[in-house]
Amino acid sequence: MKPTINPARRSFVFAGAAGASLTILPALIPTAFGKAPMAGSQAISVHRMKLGNFEITAMLDGYIDVPPTVLQADQELVKMLLTQGGWPAAPMRLPVNTFLVNTGDKLVLLDAGGAKLIGPGAGRLPQCLTAAGLTPDQIDEVYITHCHGDHLHGTVTPEGGRMFPNAILRISKADLDYWGSAVEEAKAPENQRGRWMPAKRAIAAYGDRIKPFNLGEELTAGIKSVDAAGHTPGHSCYMVQSGTARMLAIGDTMHVAPVQFPRPEITVAFDWDQAKARATRKSIFDTVAADGTPIAAVHLPFPGIGRLRKNGDAFVFDAAPWQLF
């Protein structure tokens, strides 16, 4: 005869078993050993890649917050483009990247970030160098794209000394003549004269270790200046080449990726010559999109390296894949 179980009795038995399990369950839950305070800031960011026989190290000095109103365009259009790109409408948090080139013979730093003088979010370059296994006194030369603070302040210590004590500082003659000029500073509105401070600090710290160059000049084997005037009078890009492999460090040819890639005609308020900056950007974008030369940009999301391709009158940026080696 097949035994039967009263449904009410079965429910009682199961409920009782479940209750017993629940009474002992807390004792079986382990303590959460992984609990830790939130870091509250981005990790020190360093990325290496090979370029022919050269080694490129991208380093994130930090960021600077700027309002979208610096973009010289209808603000509804700006807001739409920022939203489409997944960026907050305000403020725009622009990365500040630097790039170190190891040629095998020397270490050349392309721009030096802004230290804490451009805001609390920057000034991480020294920690980046440490993470890369380097020290500031190993840097042989520093090539500055232009004399704005987010590129030049990082060459000087808070005390006014040389951040890179053994380095030669290279700045285009056109930029140095302008930003190092008390006459030009005096011409500017009083509320803009602070823009001359980065060059004055660098000149005081490096003195005769500053070696000006002419736009278009080769500065060392494998690194050549490229005339990109417009954002500043002597704004220089740098073509880095090893064998057939090359990369163009474009400095501030562009600032805001989701706006200026689809609409390269849009300038920023701090362009020295708006029309020239616009023409330079379009020319450089057209060239690198046509020949496939990778770009390295100070204000692209880290590590800031990739290729452009044309899409009608717009451009699309394809970030370079991370190299594992």
Q: Across the structure, where does each feature detected by a protein language model lie?
A:
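Active-site metal-binding motif and surrounding structural segment of the metallo-beta-lactamase
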Residues: T98, G119-R170
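Metallo-beta-lactamase
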Residues: K35-A36, G123, T130-A131, Q138, ...
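Cap/insert and terminal regions of metallo-dependent hydrolase folds
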Residues: K2-P3, G243-F325
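Active-site metal-binding loops of divalent metal-dependent hydrolases
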Residues: D61-G62, A112-A115, C147, A174-D175, ...
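Divalent metal-coordination and catalytic microenvironments
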Residues: N53, V101, D111, I139, ...
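N-terminal secretory signal peptides
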Residues: M1-A8, A18
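C-terminal segment of N-terminal export signals and the immediately downstream linker at the start
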Residues: P26-A58
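Conserved beta-strand hairpin/beta-sheet module of binuclear metal-dependent hydrolase folds
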Residues: S45-A132, C237-M254
